[in-house]
């Protein structure tokens, strides 16, 4: 059985993520989606909790017709030491043979650890990016909804994600500066 790892922050998940996951599942039997920066939330760069992101991913993949029995989603907190982070990923995830990533630094870490690393499939990256979704949300621009699956938009609305992001971006959500 071939199992792959697909790490990302997914702040929030968008159609590009769904496309990439569907493409990777054409090449492997199972996929471990690692939701990184799991301890961060309620800040401008990371407004959603790990649980909310896992929920959004699950609903987005269900909406896209992905067989969820082939996907395992896990939270991965960051640590300051990158080799410790790599060990944590290996500890939290079921065994995997290949890593799909678009991040050159993540690719370097896994390659040096002996893993096969492949470029994650990209889908209109200039259009579909979590950064863009967050920027549109902060501005109150309804175009953000076109970039995410309907289920993700519904969750963001249900949890007050746009307001949370606007407040966080105003600088009130920086406990390390209090």
From Swiss-Prot:
It holds the Pfam family CTP_transf_like. This is Nicotinamide-nucleotide adenylyltransferase. One of its GO terms (cellular component) is cytoplasm. Keywords: ATP-binding, Cytoplasm, NAD, Nucleotide-binding, Nucleotidyltransferase, Pyridine nucleotide biosynthesis, Transferase. It is found in: Cytoplasm. GO terms for biological process: NAD biosynthetic process. Pathway: Cofactor biosynthesis; NAD(+) biosynthesis; NAD(+) from nicotinamide D-ribonucleotide: step 1/1. It comes from Pyrobaculum neutrophilum (strain DSM 2338 / JCM 9278 / NBRC 100436 / V24Sta) (Thermoproteus neutrophilus). The keyword Cytoplasm applies. It catalyses: beta-nicotinamide D-ribonucleotide + ATP + H(+) = diphosphate + NAD(+). The keyword Nucleotidyltransferase applies.
């Amino acid at each position: 059985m071939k199992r792959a790892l697909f790490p990302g922050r997914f702040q929030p998940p968008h159609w590009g993520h769904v496309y990439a996951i569907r493409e990777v599942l054409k090449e492997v039997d199972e996929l471990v989606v690692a939701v990184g920066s799991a301890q961060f939330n309620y800040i401008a760069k990371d407004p959603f909790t790990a649980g909310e992101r896992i929920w959004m991913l699950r609903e987005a993949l269900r909406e896209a017709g992905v067989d969820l029995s082939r996907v395992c989603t896990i939270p991965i907190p960051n640590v300051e030491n990158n080799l410790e982070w790599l060990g944590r990923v290996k500890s939290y995830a079921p065994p995997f043979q290949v890593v799909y990533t678009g991040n050159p630094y993540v690719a370097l870490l896994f390659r040096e650890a002996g893993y096969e690393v492949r470029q994650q499939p990209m889908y209109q990256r200039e259009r579909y990016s979590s950064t863009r979704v967050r920027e549109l949300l902060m501005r109150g621009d309804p175009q953000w909804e076109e970039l995410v699956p309907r289920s993700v938009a519904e969750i963001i609305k249900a949890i007050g994600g746009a307001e949370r992001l606007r407040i966080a971006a105003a600088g009130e959500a920086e406990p390390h500066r209090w």
